[in-house]
Amino acid sequence: MKKIIIIGGVAAGMSAAAKARRLDKEAQITVYEKTEFVSWGACGMPYYVGGFFDDSNVMIARTAEATIKSGIDLKIKNEVIKIDSKNKKVLVRDLETNKEFEDEYDKLLITTGAKAIIPNIENINIGNVSTLKDFKDALNMKEKMKDTNIKNVAILGAGFIAIEIAHALKHLGKTVSIIQRSDRIFGNKFDKEFSDLTIEHIKEKVDLHLNEKVLSLEADDKNNVKSLITDKGKYNVDYVVIAIGVIPNSNLAKETGIKLSDNGAIIVDREGKTNIDSIYAAGDCATIYDRVLDEQNYIPLATGANKLGRMVANNLTGGEEKFLGSLGSACILAFEMELARTGITEEEAKKRNIAYKTVTIKDLDHAHYYPNYEDLHIKLVYSAKNRKILGGQIAGKRGAVLRADVIATAIYSGLTVDELGMLDLCYAPP
């Protein structure tokens, strides 16, 4: 009987386990998850904290009980602490009893995800300072935000999660400050003009501090944060959210001798294989094939994690499937503005010395004679050699994301800008 062990029970791991179970009814499939939570959707956490819904269980795609009932040997609160690739064994610690035991595998999948970057700031570990990375973070922050004494919240960072948290906390009536070291938001996910557009849109909704570096935090007599000190001033705060980004959670792989990228991601091929025989990886701990750049890249998104998890399951059970590729397609609702991106940005094309051209337009989301129209900002990046579309970015209050999906489909299919312009899409004035 084939023995498959999966380390990690969230997106990629549970997608792989469920698919492997469907493909091979006889295989023994064991999932080790160090927390008590499995199959939860991280994308919903800001909105749960912000009170858009109150039942945390709706973020769980499949309960532990349902997983076990399907024939998967799920072990929660069990952490794999060592991989013996030579003898195909893992060393596991039961976190409730602290006892250790070994388990053998024929195929091993590492899906340990990513972890929040914690900045080197004085007093960063005092009370009422947290990340929003794990399910437990969301549960804890939800309870904290019920405290009416928590009025002023500072968010460190200005990426997708930071903006979503800001939106959520404003929904709760909190006063929100965003503190960002650079002069833009979203990092390199959008070109600067889309960062500038979003800054203009949100600056009246949050206290936005760009080009400002946090130096330290100060605690009150209960060891909870009371103030935040930057290189430009001191601010009274009741809570601090750390949202400056993530890094691959790959220490276990590193200790095993698995090759890592410069940023610490587990390097895999298009089949999900690492450099060590019978060991695979998927999700936010690993690289993923970039369809535009034709190389492995680090794109930590739930969509890619779930797809790669399902694909790797085929290979764990005897197949030889290759992943068709990610475009890094992502979207966000920045208060009332939708932003979406797919493929590569102009800055990325320039950085990689790709011969490219761009076209940017501002238009209306529907016919001008029909009421309540809104502006749409659209940018395409395309090859100067063959005019194939390389990337797209769209922003607007309505319809930006669905239009970006059309661009993603065009990139995936290898369409040129000319062919995109001739697509027979639906039209009506509203």
Residue ranges and their predicted role:
Residues I7-A11, S15, R21-E26, K34-T35, ...:
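Flexible, glycine-rich terminal cap/loop adjacent to redox cofactors
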Residues I110-L172, L208, D262, V268-R270:
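Glycine-rich dinucleotide-binding loop and its adjacent helix/turn
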Residues M59-I60, N152-A154, F160-S216, I299-A305, ...:
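Rossmann-like dinucleotide-binding cores of NAD(P)H-dependent redox enzymes
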Residues I7, D103-G113, Y235-G245, G309, ...:
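Short hydrophobic core segments
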Residues V10-G13, G159-A162, A313:
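Catalytic nucleophile loop
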